[in-house]
Regions:
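Middle-to-C-terminal accessory/interaction subdomains
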Residues: 103-157, 161-176, 185-187, 196, ...
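Hydrophobic h-region of N-terminal signal peptides that target proteins for export
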Residues: 9-18
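Conserved ATP-binding subdomain of kinase catalytic cores across diverse folds
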Residues: 172-354
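C-terminal tail/sorting-segment detector
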Residues: 614-625
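Sec-dependent signal peptide recognition
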Residues: 2-10
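Residue-level detector of functionally pivotal "anchor" positions at catalytic/ligand-binding pockets or at interdomain
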Residues: 568-603
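A glycine-anchored, Pro-Gly-centered beta-turn/N-cap motif
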Residues: 72, 611-615
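Short, compositionally stereotyped local motifs that mark structural "simplifiers"
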Residues: 18-186, 192-194, 199-202, 207-213, ...
Length: 625
């Protein structure tokens, strides 16, 4: 009998599962000292082990015995220990504003250099500090403090070596040291490390804590000489934590389920960029504007959430969280199952090769081959067949967003196309939809002409190839020009009022947070790495605001009519001709008249009192300024 009792007790002990400990206060942005209690949530006999430097607790970590007192930024991580069993790690980030303001360039245990340069000789100097010229200025210090509180905090926590180890090892090397760029030495590409992610605060009062994998993301932004502030990708897999993140990240309109998220650093037109002219144009809203505008037009679009990123408690700057375009994105936005989704993109592996990151290239190749056969007749069979392979309305609007923006870093890369290829309960199979992505190099020269869908090296890109094939068809050409007239009119979605409304909504989301970004990275090209040309101390008042004024006074008021003229010249069809059928339909419905002196807007509606914009009068285009 005693033998059986011993076996039973042994089984009970060895099968006990340690539970995550609980903190008396969760993650938060803090102004003053805090006392934190850690409590056992499982077996009362458990021991709590904890660390305060971001490292993973082990059996040899400190034993918790009494409340912890914090007066500076602390990453608290704790486990419950029962025998040989350790619970999953609980993590809470306590970010002190005073610690951010005094963030130095020599944090204990962190390296003084980062990765090797790729296209020039040398090694990147590490840069951790907040610029003391800004934080030491009482006026700017107050604005930085206010800016830190404007957005949610995204705290990314992992063992220090997972980010910054110089050991060239696939399992132990630091992902911020071995960045895996698309040119040169690819060491580090795809390396993924376990991490804890917390999202908290901000206007939405976010409250998320989850374990996941973290890896670097991007193309040339991985090159240390070009960009010291890298983008990341969060990967949700069972080996790191939950298989899928279920959280309303982007609000009620969001699907709320993700297996990957991208933390976009704002590489193009940003203060840390390697190119001096690029830095002058920093606005931190161009790419998000394109995505928001695509959604405003009623199309599938990639959402965004601005955040302040912290790495192991150190402020890393202004980022935006974006959905990763993959099979989960496709399923949630287009319907069907994950296996029904094709995602096509350009992989920046040095050769900018086309790939199906999900699904196959079969439908894409069929679409491109069919487009190559398109003829001019309205009844052209190839053009009719494209309706099942391409969402033409989406494609036209996608082209017009990029043409309006004057995108000069596009076509040969920086785009996604996604489709559902099976008939499901959500409907029949769909044509490819193009998504705005990495649209950072826009709103530069108000006169730049990308009406052809291409600039310089982009002229042979897949997007422009498809566009040129479609323009051979008269029906598509008129449809495209007519839509251009509608969107680019004064009251259109790409008219000044609509464009500025989206632009200003983004500005007012980050206007205070920009002061924190400036303090973190505004001095980099002056004080740390002066590649090609010595930079300035980039500040909101001296650099950001002048560029904002330029856009509001010299770009947005004129760009719509300029692009419309460029499109008419390139296609060889006037807006008046493109809108002729639309106006004829209006007259047939008895909604208008062709009487002399009557103006038609580009949606075909008549008016006797036109405001600024483009109109049709007596069959001719009229610009009212």
């Amino acid at each position: 009998m005693k033998h059986y009792i011993h076996i039973l007790l042994t089984c009970l002990v060895t099968t006990s599962v340690a539970a995550q400990p609980k903190f008396s206060r969760q993650h938060e942005l803090i102004d003053g000292p805090k006392s934190i209690t850690v409590s056992i949530t499982g077996d009362a006999s458990a021991t709590i082990r904890y660390t305060t430097d971001g490292s993973t607790p082990t059996r040899t970590s400190k034993k918790y015995t009494s409340p912890l007192q914090f007066r500076e930024t602390t990453i608290l991580r704790a486990v419950e220990e029962i025998g040989d069993s350790l619970s999953p790690v609980a993590t809470a980030s306590y970010i002190f504003v005073s610690s951010v303001l005094s963030q130095s360039n020599n944090p204990a245990g962190y390296p003084s250099t980062w990765g090797q340069y790729t296209q020039i000789w040398g090694t990147a100097k590490a840069d951790y500090e907040m610029d003391p010229e800004m934080t030491g200025n009482s006026t700017l210090r107050s604005k930085i403090t206010e800016g830190l509180k404007q957005l949610p905090v995204l705290s990314l926590v992992s063992d220090r070596d997972n980010f910054f180890s110089h050991e060239n090892d696939e399992d132990r090397g630091g992902i911020y040291i071995f960045t895996g760029p698309p040119v040169g030495d690819p060491t580090g590409h795809g390396w993924t490390r376990p991490a804890s992610v917390e999202l908290f605060g901000g206007p939405q009062q976010h409250d998320l804590s989850v374990s996941c994998g973290v890896r670097l993301h991007g193309g040339h932004g991985r090159l240390a000489e070009k960009n010291p502030k890298h983008s990341f990708r969060l990967v949700f897999k069972e080996k790191y934590g939950p298989k899928t993140l279920k959280y309303p990240l982007f609000g009620d309109a969001s699907t709320g389920k993700y297996d990957q998220l991208v933390l976009r650093c704002h590489f193009g037109n940003a203060w840390q960029h390697w190119d001096g002219d690029n830095r002058q144009r920093a606005q931190y809203a161009r790419d998000v504007w394109a995505r928001r505008m695509q959604r405003k037009m009623g199309h599938t679009a990639v959402d965004a959430l601005y955040v302040h990123l912290f790495i192991n408690g150190m402020y890393w700057g202004l980022y935006n969280i974006a959905e990763r375009v993959d099979e989960v994105f496709g399923k949630d936005h287009l319907g069907g199952k994950e296996k029904d989704i094709d995602v096509i993109k350009i992989e920046e592996d040095g050769g900018n090769s086309l790939e199906a990151s999900e699904g196959t290239l079969d439908a894409w190749n069929e679409m491109m081959a069919t487009a190559g056969k398109v003829g001019s007749a309205a009844t052209d069979a190839a053009y009719a067949q494209l309706d099942t392979l391409l969402d033409i309305d989406n494609f036209i609007d996608y082209m017009l967003i990029n043409q309006y923006g004057g995108n000069t870093d596009w076509n040969h890369h920086n785009w996604y196309a996604v489709r559902r290829h099976n008939t499901t309960a959500d409907g029949p199979s769909q044509g490819f939809r193009f998504l705005c992505w990495d649209t950072e190099i826009i709103f530069e020269d108000v006169h730049v002409n990308v009406a052809s869908g291409a600039v310089s090296s982009d002229k042979h890109g897949y997007v422009s190839q498809l566009f040129h094939s479609l323009l051979r068809n008269d029906d598509f050409a008129r449809r495209y020009v007519r839509r251009a007239g509608q969107l680019l009119s004064a009251d259109g979605l790409l008219g000044e009022s609509s464009v500025v409304a989206v632009w200003d909504s983004l500005y007012h989301t980050i206007d205070k947070a920009l002061y924190a970004e400036a303090a973190r990275w505004g001095d980099y090209r002056r004080d740390v790495h002066q590649w090609q040309s010595r930079g300035s101390l980039y500040t909101v008042d001296d650099f950001y605001q002048p560029e904002r004024r330029r856009l509001l006074t010299k770009y947005f008021p004129y760009r719509s009519s300029i692009v419309l003229d460029q499109i008419e010249d390139y296609v060889g069809i006037s807006v008046a001709a493109g809108c002729h059928d639309l106006m004829a339909d209006t007259r047939r419905r008895g909604e208008g008249t062709a009487a002399a002196g009557l103006y038609f807007n580009l949606s075909g509606q008549p008016t006797t009192r036109p405001t600024r914009g483009v109109y049709i009068k007596n069959g001719k285009k009229i610009i009212v300024r």
